[in-house]
């Protein structure tokens, strides 16, 4: 990209910024006369309501409306914009835009709609990152490789960046695939499609079966990213909530290593190891190639172990052990991926209240599919009383054998999970063609045990240091569990001929997209999965694709129409930008370090944004003033909560369970329904279940969470009017609004005062004289109807009058909810 020259325009006095000059230049270029009709400014009410919904997803308050009406200056509007950008509501509003791109949902769909573990933490991450105005390059890099970047503390976590990597795994998935390898290929294709559309604005997934027919994307480019995804595995990791935990774990491990050096035990153990064959360290470098989460396995390669009472004992070399530092710690460890070459896989393990599983082709739903993956998950239960209080190193070893006959030739890895206060130790992994492996059974376990007696006294300061670090680590707040990504290998994926996962062609080097490498100013070094290299390529300021895509998305969300009208497809089949110069002008701001909030602020303060909706009609090759826009589903629901005075503005936390009507039936239906009003939380905090989507939100075009959606449909259909007329939610919120207006101090207000407050809440303006008169007449009719209906009742007169008042205002509230002005922006 090169910086475009800011155009000189005849109507320069109309412009407030260079953005306005680019906009006006497109109009003047179409004019055959020396003048062009300049867009008129929006009135104060329309502008405030527009900016409030665009920036916060909520209507402005009556106080904000009146303050701006009294002083509609540029400075006052800029101050309102700054307050909106600084509010928590900004992240909730713009976070929902990003969740559309991420195909965010909390279940997997298919037949039983199983949960995606802790998916809500990804939503929390997005909202927090946008509120903190994390630079776009860092934000995107965290999505691709947050676990491989320098830590970024936030949300009460020592490192929030890994939470973003759940993005890779938020798509729908099959829980009982006939072909596991094909299922993995399909899941990867979905992830690649999201990478392409959300970050490049290109349909890379079209190159899965053949070279792209229209864009310069060969099939090897698709498999370059597919290789990255296949070397990336989905795990439920542990993330520290205490920034000291990692340092304390390192201190404790160093203390154990120093103790072993002081005792001179390392040579003895290495000599012992030489007599033992097919140990885990033969295949995986003493467990150092294993990936770990949490701190339970941090000291698993130490030669000494720390007992609960503070004593030190010799530990076996070459095992993976979660109890060497402290049996109270939680964590998990995963082996590198390896090909299955024989029928049986043997693991020698011991422990209690923990479990072990074997993952085939990154298929993590083994616990959901007993037919296909029966026996791939094993639990180590609590032992009998004779072992319960003893040293973990006295626990008996056991052989766990997995039958892999159906999966020979596939890739697998072993996962150890210690998350319930127990512990687990793995001594060996071995393959054989026999169900019982003689090599495993004949290991000299007794010889090992006798050789590990600790007889040399240890210096007290060394022991105290180890115990002190262990105890300090115990005192840290526990980590959270979260869905994250990690590297599982470093191999290139072959091109799948015609998209077949069983018919391979040439290898496609990971992360080296031709369109990126051609524009990049530096070479990208591949390492591990290639995710970090991919992140570096995409966020390179010299490559225009990400920056143009993001700039276009910002313009789309603020103007209802992008500079390029197809935000997810900048290719040959997409619409050309009406101003490539303006697009590059905005994209370069992001590439050179501008944050999302900074760009949004600059655009919102332009004269173009402040123009009246639909004030001119020009060809598609020029800027179009804002159209009259319908609010999206979330804003309609949130606006009703605000109007009724019941919005719970608290932020964060687990999702509110979806409300299930009697018509929402099917397999996978949750056992309990959520509240009708979603606990009065903002819509972004409502649970998104793929098989049980909220009917009200669907009526107003909330997208299906199947793939990237950069531009929602904006339909105007009878079903929407029917939803507003008949929805249980709308009736409930109208009743709450009516009750609020007919109780407490508001009951003492005049009808006109209450009518005025309703108009401000619904439409951000005072009612006109004719509207106020009609509203009074409506209330009189409703009260009369209520009086007639209760004429024979014997209720207390005061109570009955209050009920009549509440019913009348409820009916008026419902009428305002159904008004076009309530659900549309000008």
Task: Name what the model sees in each region.
Residues 185, 316-331, 391-393, 524-528:
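Extracellular beta-rich ligand/substrate-recognition surface
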Residues 363-410, 417-425:
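Extracellular carbohydrate recognition and processing domains
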Residues 317-343, 354-357, 397-401, 534-537:
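Short beta-strands within extracellular/lumenal beta-sheet-rich domains
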Residues 1-6, 96, 107, 129-187, ...:
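Post-cleavage N-terminal segment of exported redox proteins
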Residues 345-349, 412-418:
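Extracellular beta-strand-rich recognition modules
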Residues 142, 257-303, 434-471, 483-487:
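Extracellular carbohydrate-recognition regions
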Residues 10-49, 54, 58-89, 104-142, ...:
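Primarily short, surface-exposed interaction patches in extracytoplasmic proteins
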Residues 149, 157-251, 693, 697, ...:
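Sequence context surrounding c-type heme c attachment/ligation sites in exported
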